[in-house]
Amino acid sequence: MRVVFMGTPEFSVPILTAIIGHGYEVVAAYTQPPRPAGRRGLELTKSPVHEKAEQFGIPVFTPKSLKGAEEQDVFASLEADVAIVVAYGLLLPQAILDAPRLGCYNGHASLLPRWRGAAPIQRAIMAGDSETGMMIMKMDAGLDTGPVAMAEKVAITPDMTAGELHDRLSMIGADLMIRALGALERESLALQPQAEEGVTYAAKIDKAEARIDWSKPAQDVHNTIRGLSPFPGAWCEMEINGAVERVKLQRSALGEGSGEPGTVLDDRLTVACGEGAVRLVTLQRSGGKPLPAQEFLRGAQVSKVL
């Protein structure tokens, strides 16, 4: 079976690796173009999928768009049986969707139709969901609206971070995709339309959302911290040794106590919220590494969180 793989971030890599490892012929990898990196932006960094594909000698394509006739002709010339799409980052025009003999299949990190869109892992945690999952669906022209081929549910534990859920779903996605490809080869892959009820959208994370609002209830603050950990990272400003610093909050837990929002309640860095309190477990000062709260507090007197 001739496969075109389309993906960009680290989340996609285990699925690409599994497809290769199970002997499928990956004739091309499509991924986002290299991005400027470094302090001056003079270096170009290839995506994780780009690097992995090159390790296996797979031709890599990095178009900025697939809307043009020339790019669509190149894609069609690959004569793919199927395209596998996992967090690629570009919309696929109908001409691309129609090109593979068996269609295009997407690995999506939610229980559709909940959390269609760009940031399903973060949004599920930020909303306080108790479960999510991984789904394989056949793509159509809509945004994550195609019929579902396979799904597996995953519990979201109370302190689970987006990073932890990301890694779990990525590995589940690799297993599901291999099973889906096998069923596709055997012509036994059954498709079920998505439910019409329960549709929600996982909008891309806005930078403004990452700043913690201590006037919100503790559960909301906790969900935001774990939903944005490790990236982009929730943050706040702290008065440390009399100066205001910006600090990233990588891990938290629900705490006990109450007070004016932003007040540090004890020597464990429990901070009062609009309702309840949150204990800050892992923090990161600018230019530093993530530290447990007790280590963070060595030589740092925190008087207030802003």
From Swiss-Prot:
- List, alphabetically, the GO terms of the cellular component aspect: cytosol
Q: What is this enzyme's class at the first EC digit? A: transferase
Pfam families, per this entry? Formyl_trans_C (PF02911), Formyl_trans_N (PF00551)
Q: Which reaction does it catalyse?
A: L-methionyl-tRNA(fMet) + (6R)-10-formyltetrahydrofolate = N-formyl-L-methionyl-tRNA(fMet) + (6S)-5,6,7,8-tetrahydrofolate + H(+)
Which keywords appear in this protein's UniProt record, sorted alphabetically? Protein biosynthesis, Transferase
Residues the entry annotates as binding (6S)-5,6,7,8-tetrahydrofolate: 110-113
Which HAMAP family would you find in this protein's record?
Formyl_trans (MF_00182)
- Protein name from the UniProt record: Methionyl-tRNA formyltransferase
Instruction: Write down the species.
Output: Brucella anthropi (strain ATCC 49188 / DSM 6882 / CCUG 24695 / JCM 21032 / LMG 3331 / NBRC 15819 / NCTC 12168 / Alc 37)
Query: What's the source species' lineage?
Result: Bacteria, Pseudomonadati, Pseudomonadota, Alphaproteobacteria, Hyphomicrobiales
